[in-house]
Amino acid sequence: MSKQPVISRFFKPIARKEVTSEKGVEKEKPVDLDEEKHNEPATTSRLMPKGFDAAAETVTDEVIEIEVEIEHESEPKIEIKNGTVTAENKSMDFAEKLNRIWNDKKRVISNNDNDDSDGENDTIVKKSKNNSNKLTPLDQQVKDLKLLHMDKILVIRVGYKYKCFAQDAEIVSKILHIMLIPGKLTIDESNPQDSNYRQFAYCSFPDIRLKVHLETLVHNNLKVAVVEQSETSAIKKNSNASSKNSVFERKISGVYTKATFGINSAFSSNRKNVLGQYNSIWIINFSEIDKINSSFFMISVNLNSGEIIYDTFECSTTSIENLETRIKYLNPIEVLTVSALPEKVKLRLHGSNSTILLKEKEDIDKEIMEEINKSTKGLNLSAELFELVPVLYKYLTEYNNEELLLISENYKPFASKKHMVLNAAAIESLGIFGEEGGKGSLFWLLDHTRTSFGSRKLREWILHPLLDKKEIEDRLDAVDCIIHEVSNIFFESLNKMLTNVPDLLRTINRIAYGTTSRKEIYYFLKQMKSFSDHFQLHSNYLNSQVVSNDGRIHKSSALLTNLLTEITSGLKEINIENILSMINVSSVMEKDTYKQVSEFFNLNYYDHAEEIIKIQGNINEVKNELAEELSSIRKILKRPHLNYKDEMDYLIEVRNTQTKGLPSDWIVVNRTKMISRYHTPTSRKLIEKLQYQKDILYQETQKEYFQFVKRIKNDYFALNKIINHIATYDCILALASTSQNMNYVRPVLTDESQFIDAKNARNPIIESLDINYVPNDVNLSHSAGKFLIITGPNMGGKSSYIRQVALLVILAQVGSYVPADFMKTSIFDKILTRIGAYDNLLKGQSTFKVELLEIQNIIKNKTENSLLLLDEVGRGTSTEDGKAISYSIVDYFINLPVCPLVLFTTHYPFLGSINSKILKSYYMDFVEQKKEGEDWPSIVFLYKLRSGITDSSFGLNVARLAQIDKDIINHAFSISEKIRQETETANTMNLPILLKHILSSNDLKPQQKIIEILNLQNDSQEL
């Protein structure tokens, strides 16, 4: 059998426009291939003809050489020049056939859409003398769009691909590592090289990769707009004549940034962490109080949680600690401002990867302004804060998220009398979150939540420890109740159910914004229905144990009783089953977008189905006409059992050996070696009519879907309340899981102020890392001492101990059990820390300046009910200056009318000798050892807190642990001993002079002279 030419890649569907054929020879003039740039195929989801492969329409040069195998002795070389196929030998029949195929191919492009610039051709079109300066229709459309949106990267659908053009393409190609097709690099053609090209440079990627690439682009802090076709080819053909020859209309379908990507994009239901879930959008303004201080007015929006935080705070030219704290809490990614911010504030915001956008105050629609007034009524917003709301509303309209600002229940103040605010220094130094909540943080220790929205609420709880004793007790009661009831089938089933719950809070907010997908809304309703079924199934248990006054849960936990009661009543109020029945489940699972949209509703239950049913009737009529046409075709071909090849393209297949007697007006769609496929003129018109009706159905079901979403949105408040109650339950469950750890105990809260008493307490974070942690007691009170001086060797556990105390207090006030045998504590309104040594090059601050600024902030913000942690203050400067500053700070606090509780670690032992009733001295215990070959004493850390003072930091022991050479350490020890002896000698010589000065002083009373002499004696003994 002879070989046939291998040219199957040319067999693609021919144009939908009528093309007649006589005896296999096309009556069509040659088409100039140079004009076939960017020809636009229709898109998927009824926007692209079925079977059309735009990617295959690439023309790579003016001359294309195709090597083929045929049965002749010499293999011919076939060339395609300017759209005409020629051959070098006798195989002219084959060349003629190939020429016909090539012309068919060109008609696919030209007839699909008369736009000569929307195709998938990756041809580099260089400008020639004959070429016009005029842009192609697609490029002109791109230019018009881009000039209106210069602040965005435009990702534009063209057929089965998304493309970026000009300067956008240059940026995107570098980030995504995809090919850049040369062309004009600037949209305004300002680049001198642009004159060499006829079209814009571009890069492209398949439409199925949109979400992946979109996430990458916004992760690089780009603002990206996705542009989609807003009309179909069928509707275009049936529209007015003036638009038929133009490009497809395109509109921006969505705008995305890092802050908006998570809420405006659909993800799989089991995805817990979403890009931007903790990020927020700020709008901020300020006014100067004086030359040093300024008031800042801020509104923060988290689109995922729906929270709107408003706040007024002060910053100075020397300290922006309040701004630091709010950045830690709210993670701004976009910051709007109506006036230029101070340079220090801008620098800090840029340091947190925030994009700062200057916005003008604009007048907005009167009706919207009334809605804003209504939603903010009762919040007592200052005039400075209120004027920011319309600016933020205007900005959010670009992302279709502006509706959030009209929900009054979402507004919350940053600070409240109900909870503590941990400042930025405390969050950092106590390891509250670590690296994004990673291993070794308090959040990691407590986060046993099963849902993503529960995890976010737990994060809020940790950042906002409670200040109200009753609320703390309510949480602890709920934790107790869960621990005892967890094995009950109601809780066991509910807890298991939570492990597979999607992010319901994110979904309900997406419903409010109108951006949710069909699949997502189905799973949302299905999940809410599951909760409803579960509570209904266990209604007897809930009535007897929760609702009844004699029930175990009712008696043991008011918080849990309230949660379960309100969830039950809320689920009954919303007829979720009725709403869910309106959805055709099979369509949700469809991969075909058209079917997913057009068949979404169960028309037996959907109560606005009249128009949809009418259009479906029109579609069925056309299908009946196609069936009648098939009967006529059967008679012509004398094949009574003939059927269309499929019910998509409605093709008639005829063997090539039987094509001679076919009607001349039948349209060849494509051919293979064995068969040819045809449309009749009637079937072609009916197919176009059918496609038009299908597109109308698509649009109608889209419209009805948005109305369906609005119906669910009407129950936003009730659904949001239920979801927040479920999140609270999830947090209680997480605290119960933590509290069941070995040797955790429920803390006892006392009304007595300034009191902590803990037995065998441990650092919860260090212990959770499977480290054998040595427990220590904590005793702070009026009688036991309110100011603890803690000395001891380097790495002896001083810093871990003071962190442990703060973490115990946070756990207790969050509502968790604590790692101790016993703990009794008062409630603290603030935890202020100065821990660690580091500089801040970004702010131009040295280690010592950072220290002093933090001390200044502590002194400014402390109250008598605060807990202060001061770790080795004065280490950032010389020894003498460090001693002086440390002494002054200790002296300041112990002489306050009411000194707060202070834990002060130091390497200056003399501070422990300060005479004060509230000051107590402790050290971290150790054992000295002498090893062979070492001149200095080695130590073994015992990590046990002892009463008293140690006179050495044993820094050389740390050098040994760091594996410094022994000779170097021995030499360092000899120098250290020499300096110590010289210092002792100098002080001994000065002792008589100091004694004489005290005794001869007329300013001191006899009792004061005795105290000074005793202090002098203590100092000399220490030295």
Swiss-Prot record:
Amino acids binding ATP: 792-799
The annotated region (Mispair-binding domain) lies at: 129-259
A Gene Ontology biological process term: meiotic mismatch repair
**Which residue windows are coiled coil?**
none
**Which InterPro entries would you find in this protein's record?**
DNA_mismatch_repair_MutS-lik_N, DNA_mismatch_repair_MutS/MSH, DNA_mismatch_repair_MutS_C, DNA_mismatch_repair_MutS_clamp, DNA_mismatch_repair_MutS_core, DNA_mismatch_repair_MutS_N, DNA_mismatch_repair_MutS_sf, MutS
A GO CC term assigned to this protein in UniProt: MutSbeta complex
Q: Which SMART domains match?
A: MUTSac, MUTSd
| Biased amino acid composition, Basic and acidic residues | 19-40
Q: What is its main location?
A: nucleus
**A Gene Ontology MF term for this entry?**
double-strand/single-strand DNA junction binding
Region (Disordered) residue ranges read 19-46, 108-135
Record keywords, A-Z: ATP-binding, DNA damage, DNA repair, DNA-binding, Nucleotide-binding, Nucleus
Q: Which Pfam families match?
A: MutS_I, MutS_III, MutS_IV, MutS_V
Cellular location(s) = Nucleus
Q: How does it assemble?
A: Heterodimer consisting of MSH2-MSH3 (MutS beta). Forms a ternary complex with MutL alpha (MLH1-PMS1).
The function of this protein is: Component of the post-replicative DNA mismatch repair system (MMR). Heterodimerizes with MSH2 to form MutS beta, which binds to DNA mismatches thereby initiating DNA repair. MSH3 provides substrate-binding and substrate specificity to the complex. When bound, the MutS beta heterodimer bends the DNA helix and shields approximately 20 base pairs. Acts mainly to repair insertion-deletion loops (IDLs) from 2 to 13 nucleotides in size, but can also repair base-base and single insertion-deletion mismatches that occur during replication.
Family indicated by similarity? Belongs to the DNA mismatch repair MutS family. MSH3 subfamily.
What is this protein's name?
DNA mismatch repair protein MSH3
